[in-house]
Design a protein with these regions (language model features):
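Hydrophobic hinge/microswitch elements
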Residues: 46-51, 55-59, 64-65, 121-174
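Short beta-strand->loop
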Residues: 74-84, 160, 169-183
Length: 223
């Protein structure tokens, strides 16, 4: 948190791409309404990049979904999130209600870039279950991945929070992991030596109001 020449406080907020797409645009207006003297500067990147920016004091606070490894950063899990398997209408899985992990063998996927928490979680899952898949799309934009699912017939694994519109209009069918292996948290992260201003505490309070995730009634199951 820094003081500008105009005597207004600036909070440098970092968000991962998933968080920056589905949550940060809502958080910032709420925070500025509660703290009108605070100007929020937003930076969106993947988990690894946000971690490094926090360590270099280029950001005051971050909200991430991936794993943070530095012992110099304090991590506070707050918001529930779930990855789901996204399937478009042209894919044979679209009409199914239940899939098994073996069904994913050699399927074509649209994936996030290396350094993404979403990608890491799914790759760890694939390794545990000894399945191989083909990455035919790679992008750091959730919109690009969604369009690949919609129009190119590939699969993708991404946050449920990114697809509510497509799920409601039945253009995408999703499968949730039955064992909860894709459940995760959005986490508030800051340097352990960071002085926490009232704006950071208010950001934490606002985050708690988003902690629950809505599961669609027609979601399929991946076993």
């Amino acid at each position: 948190m820094i003081l500008n020449q105009g005597q207004s406080l600036t909070l440098k907020l970092g968000s991962t791409i998933t968080v920056g797409t589905c949550l940060t645009p809502r958080l910032i207006p709420e925070l500025q309404k509660s703290c009108p003297d605070v100007k929020v500067s937003s930076n969106v990147s993947n988990t690894r990049a946000i971690e490094q920016k926090l360590l270099r004091s280029e950001l005051d606070v971050g909200i991430v979904e991936g794993e943070i490894y530095s012992p110099d950063l304090h991590v506070l899990p707050i918001v529930d999130d779930r990855l789901v398997l996204a399937v478009g209408k042209e894919h044979p899985f679209y009409l199914k209600k239940v899939l098994h992990v073996q069904d994913l063998e050699q399927e074509q996927f649209a994936m996030r870039e290396q350094g993404s928490g979403t990608r890491q979680l799914f790759e760890d899952y694939a390794t545990r279950h000894q399945i191989s898949f083909q990455t035919v799309w790679e992008a750091n934009s959730p919109g690009t991945l969604l369009n690949a699912v919609l129009y190119d017939g590939v699969l993708s694994v991404m946050s449920l929070r990114l697809m509510y519109h497509e799920i409601r209009n039945d253009s995408i069918h999703v499968f949730q992991n039955e064992n909860g292996e894709w459940n995760r948290k959005f986490k508030l992260v800051y340097h352990k030596n960071k002085f926490l201003t009232p704006a950071v505490h208010e950001l934490e309070r606002i985050l708690h109001s988003y902690r629950n995730v809505e599961i669609p009634e027609n979601a399929g199951i991946l076993r």
